[in-house]
């Protein structure tokens, strides 16, 4: 799967929790979302671009966002890409769900 496909999957998951985007929750949310992107093997610059697109419109500071993403990637460096194989296209996921019923 491409980085963009994985980011889209993660975006759908992240968007389920709208409280992540309100003041008071954003710093922790950025760190956790960056961790997920890191574990999926997404390049840090792509992760920053994605997270900026989600958090800067909420008024979050760009430098603080970059700091949190860098901190998360640094802290989780040994996990970079370790969960990339867990992602599969929706059509494949849907097929496996119907076979299990």
Model segments located where?
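Modules that initiate DNA replication and primer synthesis
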Residues: 1-100
């Amino acid at each position: 799967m491409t980085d963009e496909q994985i980011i889209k999957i993660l975006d759908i998951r992240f968007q389920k929790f709208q409280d992540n985007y309100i003041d008071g929750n954003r710093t922790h949310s950025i760190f956790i979302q960056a961790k997920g992107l890191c574990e999926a093997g997404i390049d840090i610059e792509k992760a920053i671009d994605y997270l900026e697109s989600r958090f800067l419109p909420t008024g979050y500071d760009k430098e603080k966002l970059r700091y949190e993403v860098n901190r998360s990637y640094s802290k989780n460096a040994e996990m970079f890409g370790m969960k990339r194989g867990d992602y599969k296209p929706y059509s494949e996921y849907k097929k496996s769900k119907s076979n299990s019923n």
